[in-house]
Amino acid sequence: MKSAADLQTVVEMTRSIPCAPAILPKLLKLAEGSSSDLGEMEMLINLDTGLATDVLRTANSAFFASNQRCDSISDAILRLGSKVLYRIAASTLTGRWLVHPVRGYGWEPGDLCRHSLCVAICAETLAKKMHLGDAATAYTAGLIHDLGKFALAYANFTALDDITNRVPDEFATWREAEKVILGFESTQVTKALLENWGFPSTFVSVGCYYQTPSECPGRERKIVTLIHAAKHVATQIGYGVGVDGFYYEPDELALKEVGFKEEEMDAAIPEILSTIQCFISPSGEIRFT
């Protein structure tokens, strides 16, 4: 399984999974638009019963509730606001997709979902603390950064076992093993999926370069480096980390260029853990809303 055709096969197999986060790019565009887009946003949310239920439940939760109950999606949109709504959608759709049973990487059920959520929260927290752009964008980028690994595992590649058996004895990094054994990298699968679904270039760059941000061209290097740093912190914290998680090298050049320091990332961990514990129970159950 080393040809470009195999990469395309993985992408096609994964695209067919129900509940794929394919509506997120359209929802993001609507969330960034004017109030005239609210009707279209309502229509889009109503197409997905599970998402509509999560939106209404959140709008009527103790945190957002007022004296009047929200009984419609249009009321919920007005109460929550488009940015909160998009965060709910990103978490619900991506999370629901990532909990499909898969083999490979030594994952227990839901591990990739837990790890992706942890990276998202790390990215959001670091973005706020270090003034590195929009925290909501960082959160979404963290959620979707590693979809290619899920795709490979979903495709049931026996080659993943081969990689596991040969790292670190034959290959220093998981990325190197992927290139030799598969003929392509999981980041290439992520890139292909995100492009196929119409995600903005920012997210495509994150999926493609988060392991090696120094290779990312242009203005998107900063958010790519942010996700690289968030991944490092999330791996230290440990939620859902697969067997691949400890075979990556930090891109010291990119981290230094953006201004990341080990002590600053370590200092953010208590706040990150506090937030994570709101979404992941001690038993590992995931609560997105």
Outline where the language-model segments fall.
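Terminal helices and disordered tails flanking the catalytic cores of nucleotide-processing hydrolases
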Residues: 1-9, 252-289
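Conserved alpha-helical "signature site"
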Residues: 1-248, 288-289
